Amino acid sequence: MSQKGTVQIFNSNKSPLPGVQLTATDAPATDTDANGNFQFNFSKQKPGMAIASPNVYKKGYELVNKDMINGWILSKKRPLSIVMAPEGTIEESKNKYYSISVAHFSKKQEKAIEEVNQLYIAQKISLQERSDRLKAMAEESRSFMNQIDQYAEKFARINPDDINAIEKQVLELVNAGKLSEAIELYNKSGIITQAREKLSQKTK
């Protein structure tokens, strides 16, 4: 069973990456050629069987889509597409999205806290109600930080070279600081992506 594939550079208009070293269980080690192409020649595996994530290495680069290639269903017709990025790219994008989202949320929270304090000063709410509202905001802040820790890296790994319309909207929302909306759309995008992969895996 031969599995063909390509290695491309993240966010580069699908530029090929030559000289990548690849190994997989039950297949001899191989390297990408000048066009980023490679081929695994498995001795026992057959089309339709799942494989563990191949080991992918090139000095100065990091693997971007490990989750997608882990458990890959072998196919004679469908190439294994691997994406790599210069080291530090994902962390840089993650920090960028983190900073944008925190700044947007903090501004929103500061405005809400000021409104609550003004209501209390104007004696439109009681001390207890003021305390309850501020506690609710603090809980909202904790929930927000948990969400951003969970999703910032996932957003950073979305490859602009190969995204659907919903994933494009996700990145636009994140860049606008609208994390909750981005998370909702990202989860929808995950369902669509999984469905698309299952359909494509039927063609072996």
PLM features: residue spans?
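Charged/polar helix/coil "stalk" or linker segments at domain boundaries
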Residues: 113-204
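Short amphipathic beta-strand segments in non-cytosolic proteins
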Residues: 13, 20-31
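A short, solvent-exposed loop/turn motif at the edges and junctions
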Residues: 47-72, 179
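Structural motif
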Residues: 2-17
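Short beta-strand/loop motifs in extracellular/secreted proteins, especially
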Residues: 18-20, 52
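Short, small/polar residue-rich loop motifs at catalytic or cofactor-binding pockets
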Residues: 3, 24-26, 159
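Short, acidic Ser/Thr/Gly-rich low-complexity loop/linker segments typical of extracellular
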Residues: 27-41
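Extracellular beta-sheet/turn segments enriched in Thr/Pro/Gly and aliphatic residues
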Residues: 69-103
